[in-house]
Amino acid sequence: MSTTRTDRESVAVVGGSAAGLFTSALLARRGVSVRVFERVESLEPAERTLIVTHRMRSILSRGAESSILNEIRRFELFTDGRAATIALQDPDLIIERRKLIQGLADEAQKSGAQIELGSRFHALHQNGDGLAVEVERCADGSREEVGVQTVIGGDGAASRVARAAGWAPLETVPLVQAIVPLPKDMPADTVRVWFVPQDTPYFYWLIPESPTRGALGVIGESGPETRKQLEQFLEKRKLDAQEFQGARIPVYRRWIPVRRQFGRGSVYLVGDAAAQVKVSTIGGIVTGFRGALGVAEAILNGGVSRELKALRRELDFHLLLRRSLHHFEQADYSHLVDLLNDPAKKSLGECSRDDAWKLVWRVCLKQPRLVLLGLRGLLMRSKSIDKPGA
């Protein structure tokens, strides 16, 4: 990160999320006084198997390794009896969320951040030259007012910091996945994706976390209905769920400005609290880390951040992709798979999902008819992803 200011600031980070902890480490390394407030007594978040691009390694460096369970070398796409295989030039990573957060917490503390567990955010007030964060100690109910110049909300899609500072609530969608035995015919370095638009405008996935088990999941639009659809899909694939995992994921509909002036202080949002999620795939780990890089850069650089501008362009393009795909029918996905010639598949494997402009440009150069299919998807919007509940 490039910076131009060198004065020390006091920062309170609310929420021990991946993005919040990464922001804490970035600022603490630059000499900023950072206190992290997390309501749980022990940093043992719910386990969840996730897939990310290799870009996470370049962002976190060695800090990523402890959370990596497996590497993915290819994707298999299925729709209505058709299939396509995409070989990846750089492997995707299967990670475990709990291990990731615990590793980031260790890194933040080593960098100088102070993590205070069992501390629940209660309120935000103006306080002279800065802000006062009111924190409630979960053990005994006592409260403390902490004076800081900057507050960062890293407390997820239902961020209480965002509500206190005046941001509107976010819309979310349900993610449900089941841990299952890996099918005997499935290599451990391969992800399978099924497009079933009568069930979901997104897709089903099966990601292997080891040679013997994986996570089969789906994103839907209604929580109970999504769980039911997943159970039916498991039955159809003859897979038995060993356990279920779930979450509510924010839906990116437009760029959310990440900073607000609050009295004489500043409030920032990172990660899910700012809906920094690729809405094409509902993936938010790498984009959340980019949001953390941008917020840290802005705090250290007088509000200026090139990273945030680049992230906005990336998220807006993923929104365009989602608008194109959201109302695809089975025949459209079949046509999409049929259009994936060898040069197009090669380009898909060479470019990262976290560089969507480059990926789509190269793929469409190899198969121009994909442009017409995408435009048709944009014109099929009898109901729009931009409308809540659509």
Spans of model-derived segments:
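Beta1/beta-strand and adjacent pyrophosphate-binding region of the FAD-binding site
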Residues: 4-19
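Glycine-rich FAD pyrophosphate-binding loop
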Residues: 12-14, 25-47
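N-terminal FAD cofactor-binding segment of flavoenzymes
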Residues: 39-76
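Dinucleotide-binding Rossmann-like beta1-alpha1 core, especially the glycine-rich loop
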Residues: 41, 82-103
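FAD/FMN-dependent oxidoreductases across multiple families
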Residues: 123, 222-299, 304-309
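Active-site-proximal substrate-binding core of FAD-dependent oxidoreductases
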Residues: 296-337
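C-terminal auxiliary extensions adjacent to catalytic cores
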Residues: 333-390
